[in-house]
């Protein structure tokens, strides 16, 4: 089994290894997640591997348990962030993981952008333990979180209809000058 340090360094793991590490990490309460978080993907042979990076994904914003922006993206000039409504994105589709998808994302920004929070946080049991979980309002998706340290969590996205989880890391973003355009 890979260690969490190996996974963080390589940004790569099998779903089995990532879940074994997740099971060893401390579960987190909802209030631990409040704030803005910058994310990156852990390549695990999931159909979504590379997609968020190719589209300019930044991370997530947890304002409070009832108001969560699950998909924050960079603007073209990388100086601002905007929130995307996940309802519009077909999560089960296989997208090309190239610069083309990033261009398409920027062109579609006026249609995808939202000022509304589109998820919430709850304590939910996952893998026989209860942890803070982001519940999308209009998608059958749950993102479960486990604490790596005070400023990092591992996220496991459970997408209904997809057998393997999508793995990502969130790092607390307290010092960024990025403006939120929503």
Listing of model-derived features with the role each one plays in the protein:
Residues 1-182:
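Soluble ligand-binding/transfer domains with enclosed cavities or grooves
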């Amino acid at each position: 089994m890979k260690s969490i340090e190996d996974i963080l360094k390589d940004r790569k793991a099998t779903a089995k290894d990532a879940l074994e590490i997740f099971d060893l990490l401390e579960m987190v309460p909802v209030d631990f997640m409040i704030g803005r978080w910058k994310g990156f993907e852990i390549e695990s042979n999931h159909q979504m591997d590379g997609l968020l990076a190719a589209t300019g994904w930044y991370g997530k914003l947890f304002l409070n348990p009832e108001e969560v922006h699950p998909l924050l993206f960079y603007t073209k000039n990388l100086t601002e962030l905007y929130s995307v409504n996940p309802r519009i994105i077909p999560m089960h589709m296989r997208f090309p993981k190239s610069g083309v998808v990033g261009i398409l994302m920027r062109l579609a920004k006026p249609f995808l952008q939202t000022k509304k929070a589109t998820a919430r946080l709850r304590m939910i049991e996952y893998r026989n333990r209860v942890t803070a979980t982001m519940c999308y309002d209009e998608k059958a998706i749950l993102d479960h979180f486990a604490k790596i340290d005070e400023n990092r969590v591992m996220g496991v996205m459970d997408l209904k209809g997809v057998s393997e989880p999508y793995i990502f890391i969130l790092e607390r973003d307290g010092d960024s000058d990025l403006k939120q355009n929503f």
